[in-house]
C-alpha cells in the first residue's frame, strides 16, 4: 500500500524531530534534579525523577489499570458524542429555523461547568464508570455538533444545484453530497472533542471515580495518591494522563489522515506538499 | 405536405425576474431558441446572464412570464437538461470516473450502463488515463473536461453553460472551445452559453444575445454568419476579427445605455 512506503527524507526528518524532543526532555530532567539539589525540596513536595521512575515500574499494574479505565471511559464518551453529535447535526442541518431554535442549547452544553453538574450526575447515575462516561460524553458533545452542522450546511450552492438538475432526491443530496462534504469538519470536531473527553473523564473521576474503594481511573487515583501524600505516584499518574491525551489526539489524527488523505487538501502529509 | 409543430428548445415570454429587494434583474425578456442552435449570452456584469440560465433550468422561478423548455416547464424538462457551472463542481471525494458517473447514478441508471457510458465519455474527453485520480490532482482544464463529460453522460438535449471556461488560461480555453464543438457533432444538443469573452462567443455560436443592464434586457440579437464547422483556423481569419469587433462595439454600446 502506498501509505506504507517510507520516504527516506521524511524518515530522517521524523527521527531528528524525535531526537530534538528527547533532548528537551533530558534537559528538563536535569533541571528538575538541579532544583531538588539546590533548593533541597522535600520528596513529598517534589520527588526526584528517579523516584517517579521507580514508582512507574513498581506500580505499573495499578497505573495500567487506571490508564485503561480512564481510557475506556473517555473513549466511550467520545464515541457516544460522535454518534449523538452527528445525529443532532443531521437534524440541525434540516432547517435554519431548527438551528436558530436549538443552537443556544448546544452553547449551554459548552458553557455549563462540568464540575457544577458532576454532583448531579453522580446523584442520578451513581458512582462508577457509567457516570464518568456520561460526563465525558456531555462535555465532548458540543464541538462535534457545531463542526458537523457547519460541514453539512456549508455545501456550495452550485453543488446543490447540480444535484437538483439531475432530479436528486433529498436523501441523495444528504447521503451523496452533504454527509461526505461534512466528514472533514466532523474530524475537526472529533479532534477537539477527543482532548475534552479525556479531561472530562479525569475530572469526572474526581467526583464519581469509583464504585469500589482503592480501584479506579487516573482521576480517582490522583485524588487517592494526593490524599496519601504519595507524590512520586502522583507524578507517575500525571504522566499517564498526559500520555492518554496524546494517545487520543494522535489516534484521531491518524484516522483523519487515513480517511481523508486521498482527496482532502488539509489531510495531506507534510512531505507531499 | 404536412407541417408538424416542433416546440422550440427554449421559449421565454415576457419573463421578469426580481431581486429580493424588488429591483428587476431581468425585465420582459422574450427569447426563442430553436433546436440545435448554439446561443451565447453576453453582456456587462449585472445584466442577468446567469439569472437567465437559472430561469431556463428552473433553479430560479420568474416573478412574471412563461418559460418552456421543449414545450415543458423547466422542472419537467430537467431530464433533458444538463448544466455546466463556472467551477467544475466535482465532488472532491470521488475519483474522476465516479464523478462522471454521478449524473447517471442520480438518475438511477443501471450499473452496467453507467460503466459503459462513463468509460466512453472519459475516452471522448481524453481523461481515460486519469479516471482513477481525485479532482485535486487535476489541472483546471482537466477538471472542466470531467465536468463536461458528466453533463453529457445523461444525453442532454439542452446544455446550459455558465461561463465554464472563465477560470482557465487562454490556451486551455481555446482548446476546450474546439472540443465543445467537436463533442457537439456527435450529440446534437442545443447550447445556451454564458460568457464574458466576445471571441469565445463568436467562435462557438450560431447566435449571440447581447444583454443590457439595469434592468437586464435583450439589447441585440445577432446571428453569427461565419462558416460552419468552425475550426481553430477561423480565429486567424479577418472575418472573425471583424465580427469580434462588431460584437465588442455592440457590447460597449449596451453598457452605456
For every predicted segment, state its role.
Chain B
Residues 94-101:
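Short coil-to-helix segment of the ABC ATPase nucleotide-binding domain corresponding to the Q-loop/switch region
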Residues 101, 105, 112-129, 182:
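Conserved ABC ATPase "signature" region
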Amino acid at each position: 500500500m502506498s501509505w506504507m512506503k517510507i520516504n527516506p527524507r521524511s524518515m530522517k526528518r521524523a527521527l531528528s524531530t524525535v531526537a530534538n524532543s528527547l533532548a528537551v526532555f533530558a534537559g528538563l530532567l536535569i533541571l528538575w534534579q538541579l532544583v531538588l539539589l539546590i533548593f533541597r525540596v522535600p520528596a513529598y513536595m517534589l520527588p526526584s525523577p528517579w523516584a517517579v521512575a521507580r514508582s512507574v515500574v513498581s506500580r505499573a499494574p495499578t497505573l495500567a489499570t487506571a490508564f485503561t479505565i480512564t481510557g475506556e471511559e473517555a473513549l466511550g464518551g467520545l464515541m457516544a458524542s460522535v454518534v449523538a453529535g452527528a445525529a443532532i447535526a443531521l437534524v440541525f442541518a434540516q432547517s435554519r429555523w431548527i438551528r436558530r431554535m436549538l443552537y443556544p442549547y448546544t452553547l449551554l452544553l459548552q458553557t455549563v461547568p462540568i464540575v457544577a453538574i458532576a454532583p448531579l450526575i453522580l446523584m442520578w447515575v451513581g458512582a462508577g464508570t457509567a457516570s464518568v462516561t456520561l460526563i465525558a460524553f456531555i462535555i465532548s458533545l458540543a464541538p462535534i455538533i457545531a463542526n458537523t452542522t457547519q460541514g453539512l450546511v456549508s455545501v456550495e450552492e452550485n453543488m446543490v444545484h447540480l444535484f437538483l438538475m439531475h432530479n436528486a432526491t433529498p436523501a441523495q443530496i444528504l447521503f451523496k453530497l452533504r454527509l461526505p462534504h461534512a466528514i472533514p469538519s466532523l474530524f475537526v470536531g472529533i479532534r477537539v472533542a477527543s482532548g475534552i473527553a479525556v479531561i472530562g473523564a479525569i475530572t469526572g473521576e474526581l467526583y464519581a471515580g469509583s464504585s469500589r474503594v482503592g480501584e479506579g481511573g487516573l482521576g480517582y487515583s490522583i485524588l487517592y495518591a494526593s490524599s496519601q501524600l504519595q507524590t512520586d505516584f502522583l507524578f507517575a499518574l500525571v504522566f499517564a494522563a498526559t500520555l492518554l491525551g496524546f494517545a487520543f489526539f494522535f489516534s484521531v489524527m491518524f484516522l483523519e489522515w487515513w480517511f481523508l488523505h486521498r482527496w482532502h487538501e488539509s489531510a495531506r502529509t507534510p512531505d507531499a506538499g | 405536405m404536412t407541417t408538424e409543430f416542433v416546440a422550440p428548445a427554449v421559449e421565454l415570454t415576457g419573463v421578469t425576474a426580481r431581486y429580493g429587494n424588488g429591483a428587476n434583474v431581468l425585465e420582459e425578456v422574450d427569447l426563442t431558441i430553436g433546436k440545435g442552435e448554439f446561443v451565447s449570452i453576453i453582456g456587462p456584469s449585472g445584466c442577468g446572464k446567469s439569472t437567465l440560465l437559472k430561469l431556463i433550468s428552473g433553479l430560479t422561478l420568474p416573478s412574471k412570464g412563461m418559460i418552456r423548455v421543449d414545450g415543458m416547464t423547466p422542472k419537467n424538462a430537467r431530464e433533458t437538461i444538463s448544466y455546466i457551472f463556472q467551477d467544475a463542481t466535482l465532488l472532491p471525494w470521488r475519483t474522476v470516473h465516479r464523478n462522471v458517473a454521478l449524473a447517471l447514478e442520480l438518475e438511477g441508471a443501471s450499473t452496467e450502463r453507467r460503466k459503459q457510458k462513463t468509460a466512453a465519455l472519459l475516452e471522448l474527453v481524453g481523461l481515460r488515463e486519469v479516471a482513477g485520480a481525485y479532482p485535486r490532482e487535476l489541472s483546471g482544464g482537466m477538471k472542466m473536461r470531467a465536468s463536461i463529460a458528466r453533463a453529457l453522460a445523461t444525453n442532454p438535449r439542452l446544455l446550459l453553460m455558465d461561463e465554464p471556461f472563465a477560470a482557465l488560461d487562454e490556451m486551455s480555453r481555446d482548446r476546450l472551445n474546439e472540443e465543445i464543438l467537436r463533442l457537439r457533432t456527435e450529440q446534437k444538443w442545443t447550447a445556451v452559453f454564458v460568457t464574458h469573452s466576445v471571441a469565445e462567443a463568436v467562435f462557438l455560436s450560431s447566435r449571440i444575445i447581447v444583454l443590457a443592464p439595469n434592468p437586464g434586457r435583450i439589447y441585440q440579437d445577432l446571428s453569427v454568419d461565419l462558416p460552419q464547422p468552425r475550426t481553430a483556423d477561423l480565429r486567424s481569419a479577418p472575418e472573425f476579427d471583424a465580427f469580434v469587433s462588431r460584437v465588442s462595439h455592440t457590447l460597449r454600446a449596451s453598457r452605456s445605455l
